[in-house]
Regions:
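A short, glycine/small-residue-rich beta-strand->loop->alpha-helix junction that serves as a flexible
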Residues: 10-22
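Leloir-type glycosyltransferase catalytic cores
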Residues: 166-173, 180, 317-364
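A donor-sugar binding/catalytic signature common to diverse glycosyltransferases
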Residues: 112-115, 268-308
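Conserved nucleotide-sugar donor-binding subdomain of glycosyltransferases
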Residues: 75-111, 118-119
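Glycosyltransferases and closely related glycan-assembly transferases
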Residues: 52, 101-111, 121-134
Length: 364
């Protein structure tokens, strides 16, 4: 493939899509391509982690983008309030789309890669953009006809598939990142690919020390983890979460340590932890599986996507799931866990070639 100029758009909730974008940057630069700009769509309640500025070697822009509204404790998702927020902020999002149009015109990329930001789908629906658009996210697996949704929850399933389809509007290809391989989809735009994980993971050596690692996409859940810890003060906890609106970062007690998001430190501690406890995202679970660390997944309340992720990861052998932060479950599970994730590691190790070949197939 001839040298191309790429422009990234990334949904900035949590760290998963940002981590995937960083990993994709490394793959493309290794092949001699250029990343001209990264645009991160976020809500005002989020901060772009410092490590993101350190890892991208191009200009970074921030846009207001639709995201979920949480409850007053910053835990669960309020679906109705989230929809009303989109309507109430329509003017703000229209401004974001105008900025996107200006930046795309100025940068003149050969390719746009969208890591699940809905504004990109809206942009392609409302503008006659000729730049090829490829989207990359775990969520596109929901459009594969063989994906097994949890039973029931048909309205949630419809809404999730609709929103996922919106983010991919106008895309020439949708790379569906998966815990496992699947047969080719009848929709030739959907391609199942292995997890897109950062290169540092492959050079780290796993060990086991006497502590548990926690990652919370919504920092309101820290009270739940702390409540469990107060009943088990002998257990050592290292907890990472968004520092925005968090009253303190540091040592809560002798054995409870809170960290702001730091990709290097997080990975180092994961390699040494007994297990990972996390809201049921995708990226951190994959990293833990690769390092053969058992996982307790607790879906964010009202977040159907995470509800699906937890069950999908369970069937893939990641660990266990729960509707609350009952860390005793993972303490007991980890003590008897002898999981062999060698097939998952082989799948992940094929990621770079698989993903780059999919890009080449439409960009030659």
């Amino acid at each position: 493939m001839k040298k191309k100029k790429f422009m990234f758009f990334v949904q900035g909730e949590g760290r998963g899509h940002l981590t995937q974008a960083i990993a994709m940057q490394d793959i493309l630069m290794q092949e001699g391509h250029e990343i001209s700009a990264v645009v991160i769509g976020m809500s005002p309640r989020r901060e772009i982690p410092a490590y993101v500025y350190q890892r991208f070697i191009c200009p970074i822009h921030r846009l207001d983008s639709p995201n979920f509204v949480t409850d007053k404790h910053n835990k669960g998702i309020k679906v109705g309030a989230s929809i009303l927020s989109v309507v109430a902020n329509a003017g703000k999002f229209n401004k974001s789309i105008r900025l996107m149009h200006e930046w795309i015109g100025e940068i003149d990329p050969d390719v746009i890669l969208n890591f699940f930001d809905p504004l990109v789908g809206l942009y392609y629906l409302t503008h006659n953009c000729k730049v090829p658009h490829i989207c990359v996210a775990h969520q596109y697996i929901y459009h594969h006809e063989d994906f097994q949704f949890p039973r029931g929850k048909f309205s949630d399933r419809f809404a999730l598939k609709w929103f996922t389809g919106l983010t991919g509007s106008g895309a020439v290809k949708r790379l569906a990142i998966s815990f496992y391989g699947m047969s080719p989809s009848k929709n030739n735009k959907i391609k199942i690919v292995p997890p897109l994980l950062r290169k540092e993971l492959f050079n780290i050596k796993a060990s086991e020390k006497d502590f548990y690692l926690v990652y919370l996409v919504n920092n309101g859940y820290i009270a739940d983890v702390l409540s469990w810890h107060q009943q088990h003060p002998d257990k050592v906890i290292h907890c990472f979460t968004d520092k925005n609106q968090l009253p303190s970062i540091g040592d809560v007690s002798e054995n409870f340590h809170v960290h702001q998001l730091d990709d290097k430190k997080f990975l180092e501690l994961m390699a040494e932890a007994k297990a990972l406890v996390t809201t049921a995202g995708f990226e951190s679970v994959c990293e833990a599986m690769y390092l053969q660390k058992p996982v307790l997944m607790v879906p964010v309340q009202g977040h159907f996507e995470q509800y699906c992720n937890a069950r999908d990861a369970f069937y893939a052998g990641a660990g266990i799931y729960s509707d609350a932060f009952h860390l005793q479950n993972i303490v007991e599970f980890a003590s008897g866990s002898t999981a062999d994730n060698s097939s998952f590691r082989d799948w992940v190790n094929s990621s770079q070639d698989c993903i780059y070949n999919e890009l080449k197939s439409v960009l030659q």
